[in-house]
Amino acid sequence: MQDFLQLTLSGGQPEQKEGRNGLLRWRWLNVGILELTPLHSVPRALVVSSGIHGNETAPVEIVEQLVNALLRGELALQARLLVIYGNPAALRLNRRYVHGDMNRMFGGRWQQYEDCPEARRAWILEQAMDNFWQAGDYEEVRWHLDLHTAIRGSYHAQFGVLPQRMTPWPEDFMHWLASAGLEALVFHRATGGTFTNYSSRHFQAASCTLELGTALPFGHNDLTQFAAVRLALRQLIAGGENIPAAAQPRRYRVSQQITRRSDRFVLHMSDEVLNFTAFPQGTLLAEDGEDRVYVQQAREYVLFPNPNVATGLRAGLMLVEDNVHNKAL
């Protein structure tokens, strides 16, 4: 087929909507949504998404290389694969989003937004994921990797955020995340509106949001910084063994959320504060009218601080180290 990324950015449709090479069949399902299926039976179904935020281009470029290699027959495919470029309209504009943050709209939350292109797109992506996994065998292993970059710099340059899960995480999934070069893993303890929360909660997929560096425009990313995750993705898609991790990721869990509830909200952090900056117990983190948010534990670490979110949305997460796991590293 034509270049999938360029086709997505143009908003066009391919002349042929399905085809095959010697290793796989492909189907163009919608703008930015491509299904690739091996010509033989496989036990795994994998969703790889990127571009949910339109200014986070490095993951899109990483996925583009994989898709091109698959379509040219240069890379074997050992999983059913659904590739998603999440927000084509925002990607064209190099903006985080056009009207609203799509990664707060999944799990049906898109119904709360009227006349919002991101809400309509979230519904389309939910349907595509539903159809993809329903088409597979009930026993197949389901993984969802949602690739992002962070707005701010970070003490952990690359890290993963895992949604709430009621059952233990599969060991092979944890090993893969380590082999991808992630320096830290953050575990949510509550449900939310992210794409990975949707895939985990509704389809019992092993899901992770991978935060890979900082947001830059197309053509300005140094993809050599992501050598570990690029190799890990190739190995996963081609059915190879995990590359041994250089080090095990540090583990954190969410201790509290900072939410902007009114126009009087003030976040007591500078724009230069990095993700995973530590604050001691008793530190005033935010004010919102008469409400105050303080560090509750002996030490908490901030993640995704953003005072400019819309009212009602998350303005930051506070984390504590998961010492039970970290002592075993």
Curated annotation (Swiss-Prot):
The active site is at E211. It catalyses: N-succinyl-L-glutamate + H2O = L-glutamate + succinate. Binds 1 zinc ion per subunit. Keywords: Arginine metabolism, Hydrolase, Metal-binding, Zinc. It holds the Pfam family AstE_AspA_hybrid. Transmembrane segments: none annotated. Its EC number is 3.5.1.96. It comes from the Bacteria. Zn(2+) binds at H53, E56, H148. Its cofactor is Zn(2+). One of its GO terms (biological process) is arginine catabolic process to glutamate. One of its GO terms (molecular function) is zinc ion binding. Pathway: Amino-acid degradation; L-arginine degradation via AST pathway; L-glutamate and succinate from L-arginine: step 5/5. Gene3D superfamilies: Zn peptidases. InterPro entries: AspA/AstE_fam (IPR050178), AstE_AspA_cat (IPR055438), Aste_AspA_hybrid_dom (IPR007036), SuccinylGlu_desuccinylase (IPR016681). Belongs to the AspA/AstE family. Succinylglutamate desuccinylase subfamily. Transforms N(2)-succinylglutamate into succinate and glutamate. This is Succinylglutamate desuccinylase. It comes from Erwinia tasmaniensis (strain DSM 17950 / CFBP 7177 / CIP 109463 / NCPPB 4357 / Et1/99). The lineage of its organism: Bacteria, Pseudomonadati, Pseudomonadota, Gammaproteobacteria, Enterobacterales. The gene is astE.
